[in-house]
Amino acid sequence: MAWNTPKVTEIPLGAEINSYVCGEKK
């Protein structure tokens, strides 16, 4: 799972995606 996103938006975007994916898996 590789996301080609700028470092500036990588942290908030990554956190949002992570929480979404975690919620989907659970």
From Swiss-Prot:
Keyword terms of this UniProt record: PQQ biosynthesis
Pathway(s) per entry: Cofactor biosynthesis; pyrroloquinoline quinone biosynthesis
Keyword Cell membrane: no
One Pfam family named in its UniProt record: PqqA
TM regions (residue ranges): none
UniProt KW Disulfide bond keyword: no
Recorded superkingdom: Bacteria
Cited InterPro entries: PQQ_synth_PqqA
Pyrroloquinoline quinone (Glu-Tyr) crosslink site(s): 16-20
One GO BP: pyrroloquinoline quinone biosynthetic process
HAMAP family in the record: PQQ_syn_PqqA
Function as written in the Swiss-Prot or TrEMBL entry: Required for coenzyme pyrroloquinoline quinone (PQQ) biosynthesis. PQQ is probably formed by cross-linking a specific glutamate to a specific tyrosine residue and excising these residues from the peptide.
Family: Belongs to the PqqA family.
Protein name, per record: Coenzyme PQQ synthesis protein A
The species this protein was found in: Gluconobacter oxydans (strain 621H)
Gene name of the record: pqqA
